[in-house]
């Protein structure tokens, strides 16, 4: 019986040492230390041992079982710590993996076109000048050869703030402001918001314009045509036919409306171009001598040209959009396309 107990002890210790997982540890407990385990079976057999050996064998059996139970608890504690450390390690982020790309919005289509227009003119040597949205009547009208009661003022549905203060109806006031402070030669564009009391599928009360001005000696209409033709080919990324039609603007003389071949039909004639094959895109002309006199330039020495274009108009043609109001309705289905 004593030898049987020692054999069982050696077998149990060897089995416990080899255990590496909690599942195997539970199987060990049931096999050796459970109610129906091997040690329980041996303890029940002590009754058949000689009476004089029973106390010694019982004490030996209890000692072996107590030692195994202590070693069992140590093993369980060790495995529990290993499992906890492993879980902690697995829960840590892998810093070697690439990070998630943050969600970011896109620039508004009007902003994209505005930046593209400015970049094209900057590449031609034009500087960018910005001015106030709330303007004085003098710079918005009088300095541009549009005095009080001039019939040309009827062309502008103006938002007046108070007295002679108004929301600018075009970015042309920056021409006068820049020329007052800078001697020729100069090349500048003035991008920004403008305001007119008008709202339909092709007009909004607030929209964006870019005004351009070039002043130097011996500037001719041919220079104007060359600059604008190059710009239109670059902004629409194709060699579009361009034509200049006589027109009238108070601050330029001669003046012209600039048309391009319809981008919808390629100049063949469609509903958008009203079967003409042409689309009006901007206005331009040679700076009127009266404007030069207002800012102290000598019109006998210097000449120049000016032009103005609507950013929304460019964007509508560039992206084939038929309603200007889509730009300002904040519809993500529309804006996410750009």
UniProtKB/Swiss-Prot annotation:
Q: Which SUPFAM superfamilies match?
A: Class II aaRS and biotin synthetases, tRNA-binding arm
For molecular function, the Gene Ontology terms on record are: ATP binding; magnesium ion binding; phenylalanine-tRNA ligase activity; tRNA binding
Q: Which PROSITE patterns match?
A: AA_TRNA_LIGASE_II (PS50862)
Q: Please share the entry's free-text remark on the cofactor.
A: Binds 2 magnesium ions per tetramer.
Q: Where in the cell is it found?
A: Cytoplasm
Q: Provide one Gene Ontology biological process annotation.
A: phenylalanyl-tRNA aminoacylation
EC number(s) for this protein? 6.1.1.20
Major subcellular location class:
cytoplasm
* Compositional bias per record (Low complexity), positions renumbered to this chain: 78-92
Q: Which UniProt keywords apply?
A: Aminoacyl-tRNA synthetase, ATP-binding, Cytoplasm, Ligase, Magnesium, Metal-binding, Nucleotide-binding, Protein biosynthesis
Give me the Gene Ontology terms describing cellular component. cytoplasm
Question: According to its UniProt record, which cofactors does this protein need?
Answer: Mg(2+)
Query: In its keyword annotation, does this UniProt entry include ATP-binding?
Result: yes
Q: Where is this region: Disordered?
A: 71-101
Which reactions fall under this protein's catalytic activity?
tRNA(Phe) + L-phenylalanine + ATP = L-phenylalanyl-tRNA(Phe) + AMP + diphosphate + H(+)
Q: Which residues bind Mg(2+)?
A: 253
The family line of this record is: Belongs to the class-II aminoacyl-tRNA synthetase family. Phe-tRNA synthetase alpha subunit type 1 subfamily.
Q: How does it assemble?
A: Tetramer of two alpha and two beta subunits.
Entry's NCBIfam families? pheS (TIGR00468)
Name the chain's protein: Phenylalanine--tRNA ligase alpha subunit
